[in-house]
């Protein structure tokens, strides 16, 4: 009951605290192309995360589940949206259903709605091999997200305080999983050092989950009597984290998430090196406040606008979009220079 109540609290406070939009994409400018040699009607948006082929570089990221009928209904609607637009979708942490079988329906509903969809299971880094297998089987998942949420746990009144052995547990799951593993942050970004550690234990796909979207420190602080306000601005911005990711020069698939709301955000994230982008809080807000039809329309417009931007840049495919010239400036540039990451290659390609 406590876990289910927390799930509902997260939805309420995620909506009320909003998104900060401090993602850093305002520091990224495309180099205009007056002769793009492109045709809107022939632009294609297919992409891949590792070996998983996706029809769109937009997917519905982990949001909820395990909070009774309300979370079941949300996942049911999101699965319908995913089916309508042929998008991949992740569920929220399934630990609730592993602890209480009665909550499993709030996750399993997605397969009922969209039997042939691409779905990602989701667990925290405390998960065991056996729990990972059960989570995947629960929704017949195509991949498993393992989320890293140290700051959220520390801010959460009833959260974990021991984070020893996390990398070793992830390595065991990677070695024993029958589906690909995606390690993701939850709004605080990932450093190049963290990503290198994950690569070293066999991880091949990462969702950088940058600062700029739903702020889970702020969400958990709403649930505390004594706020840990020093965590409210903690983290690495989304744009910065993508560039940190690409600087590792590893054969990783990168998912960009954290405050992404527009087609321009999507295009910039991909041009910086992401293979795909993920939306959570923005989609949830539209669904809860304006309804499912509005969300369906918004996703249609996102795809239309992304193709307009790709046409302007002369990028006929997502792969070509990853190599268009752009300039990194402002605070993002200064952060990266201090970190020893040269951005000049982006502007000269």
UniProtKB/Swiss-Prot annotation:
Keyword NADP applies: yes
Cofactor(s) of this protein: FMN; NADPH; Mg(2+)
Pfam family, any one: FMN_dh
Keyword Transmembrane: no
GO-annotated cellular components: cytoplasm
List of residues binding Mg(2+): 153
Predominant location: cytoplasm
Record-level GO BP terms: isoprenoid biosynthetic process
Gene3D superfamilies in the cross-refs: Aldolase class I
Catalyses which reaction(s): isopentenyl diphosphate = dimethylallyl diphosphate
InterPro entries reported for this sequence: Aldolase_TIM (IPR013785), FMN-dep_DH (IPR000262), IPdP_isomerase (IPR011179)
Amino-acid positions noted as binding FMN in the UniProt annotation, renumbered to this chain: 62-64, 93, 122, 184, 214, 258-259, 280-281
GO MF, one example: oxidoreductase activity
Residues noted as binding substrate in the record, renumbered to the chain: 6-7, 152
Enzyme Commission identifier(s): 5.3.3.2
Domain of life: Bacteria
Membership in a protein family: Belongs to the IPP isomerase type 2 family.
The protein's name: Isopentenyl-diphosphate delta-isomerase
The encoding gene: fni
């Amino acid at each position: 009951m406590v876990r289910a109540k927390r799930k509902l609290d997260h939805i309420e406070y995620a909506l009320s605290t909003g998104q900060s939009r401090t993602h850093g994409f305002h520091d990224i400018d495309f180099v205009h192309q007056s002769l793009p040699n492109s045709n809107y009607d022939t632009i294609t948006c297919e992409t891949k995360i590792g070996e998983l082929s996706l029809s769109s570089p937009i997917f519905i990221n982990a949001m909820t589940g395990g909070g009774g009928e309300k979370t079941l209904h949300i996942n049911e609607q999101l699965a319908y949206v995913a089916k309508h637009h042929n998008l991949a979708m992740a569920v929220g942490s399934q630990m609730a259903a592993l602890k209480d079988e009665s909550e499993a329906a709030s996750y399993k509903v997605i397969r009922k709605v969209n039997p042939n969809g691409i779905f990602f299971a989701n667990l925290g880094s405390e998960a065991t091999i056996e729990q990972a297998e059960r989570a995947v089987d629960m929704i017949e998942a195509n991949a498993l997200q393992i989320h890293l949420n140290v700051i959220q746990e520390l801010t959460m009144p009833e959260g974990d305080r021991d984070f020893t052995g996390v990398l070793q547990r992830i390595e065991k799951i990677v070695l024993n999983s029958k589906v690909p593993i995606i390690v993701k942050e939850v709004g605080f970004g990932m450093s190049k050092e963290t990503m290198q550690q994950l690569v070293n234990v066999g991880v091949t796909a990462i969702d950088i989950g940058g600062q700029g979207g739903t702020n889970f420190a702020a969400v958990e602080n709403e649930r505390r009597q004594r706020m840990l306000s020093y965590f409210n601005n903690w983290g690495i911005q989304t744009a910065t984290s993508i560039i940190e990711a690409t600087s590792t020069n590893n054969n990783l698939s990168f998912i960009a998430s954290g405050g992404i709301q527009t087609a321009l955000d999507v295009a910039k994230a991909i041009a910086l090196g992401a293979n795909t982008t993920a939306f959570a809080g923005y989609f949830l807000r539209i669904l809860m406040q304006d309804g499912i039809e509005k969300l369906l329309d918004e996703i249609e417009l996102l795809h239309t606008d992304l193709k307009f931007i790709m046409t302007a840049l002369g990028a006929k495919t997502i792969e070509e979009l990853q190599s268009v010239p752009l300039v990194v400036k402002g605070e993002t540039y200064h952060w990266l220079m201090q970190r020893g990451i040269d951005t000049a290659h982006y502007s000269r390609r």
